[in-house]
């Protein structure tokens, strides 16, 4: 009754796209729930906590490192997956210099929303084109190839958590005056019931402002990036599913007037070692991003990514999220039909 029968998925074959990870991770869930707004999400959480269910939050489920699906079938309690893709609004504030990203909003939609303002999101990596969510990236400090901007990070968020007494509570660290009670706060944010005077400007960060300095420390003993870096664990940032994120406040960036992509190849990895050190220590402007690609990856892309190439060339990137969703559905069906090969879409 709360979300409507259409958005409570219990049939096994209908649950599979939500129970299976992009690269790995799968397991059985009691149900998949798809709330349409913050109030529905909040009330679902209260029911799940009362019933002592395990809650796995999920948005686009495009992650390559797992976490958005069950992992095996040896959990001690029933699992409920809450998929947030219907809660996908993005609100622009401070002349589009910042955004409020709702739980299921995607980098792809944000990129398009910022275009008229000549600005772009923090993340401009490949997952943008396949529908990756904004919140998922921040919860995992994603953006490993982003040299200039570094990890996805903010100290401004609205999220739910269990307190020490095991009670569900809503934490408003968004820096916007939205009211006192949980449902008032959620309803006001959902409907944009706030004005510029309600937006608080303080020292809390909406992006990682130190990474460009850290990454230049080429002679330091510690790496510029590593898992569970305490510097990047704050509220929703780096939470990895331990809290339920309703919304994030994030910085946006001026769009570069000129961009150029360089592809460099070598049989000697020491060449790249020297290039990396020279770029980080001597360049006035850091590259937006950089990636290493092994020859095997190149060969695999050449063999298996012709469909992507054709779609981008003929239709542009707009169709890519739909293509990847179709690909996933085909592979799930093929895995259940004995005479069809696994990963049928790649053949």
What are these regions (language model features)?
Residues 1-50, 62-100, 250, 297-304:
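N-terminal flexible segment immediately upstream of the FAD-binding catalytic core
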Residues 3, 50-53, 118-121, 280-289:
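A common structural junction motif
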Residues 40-43, 109, 269-275:
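Short, conserved charged micro-motifs
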Residues 117-119, 123-271:
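FAD-binding subdomain of flavoenzyme oxidoreductases
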Residues 249-254, 260-347:
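C-terminal substrate-recognition/cap domain of FAD-linked oxidoreductases
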């Amino acid at each position: 009754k709360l979300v409507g029968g259409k958005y409570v998925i219990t049939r096994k074959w209908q649950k599979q796209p939500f129970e299976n990870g992009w690269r790995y991770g799968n397991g059985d869930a009691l149900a998949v729930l798809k709330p349409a707004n913050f109030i529905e999400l909040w009330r679902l959480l209260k029911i799940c906590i009362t019933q002592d269910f395990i809650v796995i939050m999920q948005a686009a489920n495009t992650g390559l490192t797992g976490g958005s699906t069950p992992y095996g079938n040896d959990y001690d309690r029933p699992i409920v997956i809450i998929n947030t893709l219907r809660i996908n609004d993005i609100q622009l504030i401070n002349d589009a210099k910042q955004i409020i990203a709702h739980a299921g909003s995607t980098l792809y939609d944000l990129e398009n929303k910022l275009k008229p303002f000549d600005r772009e999101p923090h993340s401009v990596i490949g997952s943008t084109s396949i529908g990756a969510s904004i919140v998922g990236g921040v919860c995992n400090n994603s953006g490993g190839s982003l040299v200039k901007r570094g990890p996805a990070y903010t100290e401004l968020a609205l999220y739910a958590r269990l307190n020490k007494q095991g009670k569900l509570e809503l934490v408003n660290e968004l820096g916007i005056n939205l009211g006192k009670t949980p449902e008032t706060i959620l309803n006001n944010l959902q409907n944009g019931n706030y004005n510029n005077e309600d937006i608080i400007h303080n020292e809390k960060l909406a992006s990682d402002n130190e990474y460009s300095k850290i990454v230049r420390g080429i002679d330091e003993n510690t790496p510029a990036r590593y898992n569970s870096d305490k510097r990047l664990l704050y509220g929703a940032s780096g939470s990895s599913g331990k809290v339920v994120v309703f919304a994030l406040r994030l910085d946006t960036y001026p769009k570069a007037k000129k961009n150029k992509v360089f592809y460099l190849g070598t049989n000697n990895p020491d060449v790249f070692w020297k290039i990396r050190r020279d770029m980080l220590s001597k360049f006035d402007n850091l590259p937006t991003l950089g990636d290493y690609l092994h020859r095997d990856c190149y060969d695999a892309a050449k063999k298996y990514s012709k469909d992507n190439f054709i779609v981008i060339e003929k239709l542009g990137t707009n169709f890519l999220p739909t293509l990847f969703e179709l690909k996933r559905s085909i592979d799930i069906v093929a895995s259940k039909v004995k005479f069809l090969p696994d990963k049928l879409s790649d053949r």
